[in-house]
């Protein structure tokens, strides 16, 4: 029998993207709820309990509610795309390239927390340096990022695309999270293996999909002997053999004059770059991805496929 997949929240931005990625797949049976019934709790509960894998594309509280609906059904497995369970110790973190053992953990898990878009880029850069001993305990990590506006969901999409809206956002680029309490910080700290929470400054650009995440470093404050080459080598070694995460060669990065945040829009891959000053005193690590691709829906489908391979 074909595995049954239910996307709870399929009419939202992430849910629609997941549904698009599954279109044409004959190996799955997709369960669906009419948009008019999406708030029908009884119908949702029935579909959740009928699924082999339920993918939750809901706000945090609604995701917790959905998990409770299948609490007594050990057959149903869950992928949650909200922030509700990303630092929960009994949930597998759905960044398959994070560690060599992570694909197996995802494959065998009943509950998988899909990573956030910003943390996907930040953790991809930070964790290999922590594991290689290059980034010391207590280093004051800073993460700067810009995302396509689709990351804000239907509300922000309308605010930017509808110039007749009273809430129309005219600015081509804006900062938010100004209190430095963004909901993605805890997972950056936990899965980035950091002792101190990073200072995270997110922003949104007037483009639909795409993302740049930057982690700047003072080389003199890293482990003794650290260089741009050793930082790059740590990333290369960590992602060796991975098809989704590409570490761009140093010589190729050195030829670049700019990076376009939309380069990977519509793709489920990620590129990592390492840039540095001529004297080697400063390094800037950069992750490039689609906020709706590897940063959300693409990762959810990747995790689903890993779970189905069990």
UniProtKB/Swiss-Prot annotation:
Record-linked SMART domains: Semialdhyde_dh (SM00859)
One Gene Ontology cellular component annotation held by this UniProt entry: cytoplasm
Pfam annotation, one family: Semialdhyde_dhC_1
The entry's keywords: Amino-acid biosynthesis, Arginine biosynthesis, Cytoplasm, NADP, Oxidoreductase
GO biological process annotation, one example: L-arginine biosynthetic process
Active-site residues annotated for this sequence: 117
Domain of life of the native organism: Bacteria
Keyword Transit peptide: no
Compartments where found: Cytoplasm
Pathway info: Amino-acid biosynthesis; L-arginine biosynthesis; N(2)-acetyl-L-ornithine from L-glutamate: step 3/4
Catalysed transformations (reactions): N-acetyl-L-glutamate 5-semialdehyde + phosphate + NADP(+) = N-acetyl-L-glutamyl 5-phosphate + NADPH + H(+)
Gene3D superfamilies linked to this entry: Dihydrodipicolinate Reductase, domain 2, NAD(P)-binding Rossmann-like Domain
GO molecular function: N-acetyl-gamma-glutamyl-phosphate reductase activity; NAD binding
The enzyme's E.C. designation: 1.2.1.38
Function: Catalyzes the NADPH-dependent reduction of N-acetyl-5-glutamyl phosphate to yield N-acetyl-L-glutamate 5-semialdehyde.
PANTHER family referenced in this protein's UniProt entry, alphabetically: N-ACETYL-GAMMA-GLUTAMYL-PHOSPHATE REDUCTASE, CHLOROPLASTIC-RELATED, N-ACETYL-GAMMA-GLUTAMYL-PHOSPHATE REDUCTASE, CHLOROPLASTIC-RELATED-RELATED
Similarity comment: Belongs to the NAGSA dehydrogenase family. Type 2 subfamily.
Protein name according to UniProt: N-acetyl-gamma-glutamyl-phosphate reductase
Lineage: Bacteria, Pseudomonadati, Pseudomonadota, Alphaproteobacteria, Hyphomicrobiales
């Amino acid at each position: 029998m074909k595995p049954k997949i239910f996307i709870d929240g399929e009419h939202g931005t992430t849910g629609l993207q997941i549904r698009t990625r599954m279109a044409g797949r004959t190996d799955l049976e997709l369960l669906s709820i009419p948009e008019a019934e999406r708030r029908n709790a009884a119908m949702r509960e029935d579909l959740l309990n009928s699924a082999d894998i339920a993918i939750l594309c809901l706000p945090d509280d609604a995701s917790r509610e959905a998990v409770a609906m299948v609490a007594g059904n050990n057959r149903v497995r869950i992928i949650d795309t909200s922030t509700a369970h990303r630092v929960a110790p009994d949930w597998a973190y759905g960044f398959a390239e994070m560690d060599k053992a992570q694909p197996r953990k995802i494959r065998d898990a009943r509950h998988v927390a899909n990573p956030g878009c910003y943390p996907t880029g930040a953790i991809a850069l930070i964790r290999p340096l922590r594991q290689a001993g290059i980034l010391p305990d207590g280093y004051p990590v800073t993460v700067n990022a810009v995302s396509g506006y689709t990351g804000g969901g239907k509300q922000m999409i309308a605010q930017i695309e509808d110039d007749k809206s009273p809430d129309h956002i005219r600015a081509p680029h804006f900062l938010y999270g100004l209190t430095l309490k963004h909901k993605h910080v805890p997972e950056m700290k936990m899965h980035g293996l950091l002792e101190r929470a990073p200072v995270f400054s997110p922003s949104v650009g007037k483009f639909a999909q795409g993302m740049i995440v930057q982690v700047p470093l003072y080389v003199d404050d890293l482990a003794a002997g650290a260089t741009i080459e050793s930082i790059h080598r740590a990333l290369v070694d960590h992602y060796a053999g991975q098809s989704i995460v590409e570490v761009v060669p140093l010589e190729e990065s050195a030829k670049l004059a700019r990076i376009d945040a939309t380069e990977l829009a519509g793709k489920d891959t990620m590129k990592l770059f390492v840039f540095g000053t001529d004297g080697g005193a400063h390094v800037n690590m950069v992750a490039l991805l689609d906020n709706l691709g590897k940063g959300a829906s693409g990762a959810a489908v990747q995790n689903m496929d890993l779970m189905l391979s069990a």
